[in-house]
Amino acid sequence: MTGRLLPDPSGGDLRVPAGPPPEEGTVLPIPVGATATLDVVVTPELTVHFDELGPVHPVYATYSMAKHFEEAGRKLLLRHLEPGEGGIGRSVAVEHLGPSWVGDAVTVTARCTEVSGNRLTCACTATDADGRELGRGTTVQVVLPDELLESRIGPAAQARRRGTDPRG
């Protein structure tokens, strides 16, 4: 491990304390302004369809846009992770500005706006082939050691939570 990551002071979850960036040497090497893009074609699976209510609108769903914002931000982050590091989503915000229909091409762009300690904040946009802005928002990801992520969200953590951990 490189020592770039914050320790996990909470001992019980994946939260990272608020406040100023940690000591020198823990900032992710991602330059503000760096971008990653994701090209999407709207399919029926990406339209508004609720489990209990069924199909609602035949347009690109806000929740699909949120997923693509997170994916574009992760695509940016992955290029900068070191061996033994992993990322996990902390927050996503979406403002859906206009519709796009099945068959439409959408470009999702994540742009690094801030790096603070082991947190990456991206401004995200979704635009159609004509350059019309369909949505905007932000994502925040936290970088942690793989072992910590595995201990908190892997199969053993799930078994502990359900009370089925064979270790007792």
Per-range role (PLM):
Residues M1-V40:
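N-terminal leader/capping segments at the start of a protein or of a new domain
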Residues A34-L38, I88-V92, D104-V108, N118-L120, ...:
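A generic structural signal for short beta-strands and their flanking turns/coil linkers
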Residues T37-T43, E95, V140-V142:
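Generic structural detector for well-ordered beta-strands
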Residues G73-T107:
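Hydrophobic beta-strand-centered segment that forms part of the acyl-chain substrate-binding groove
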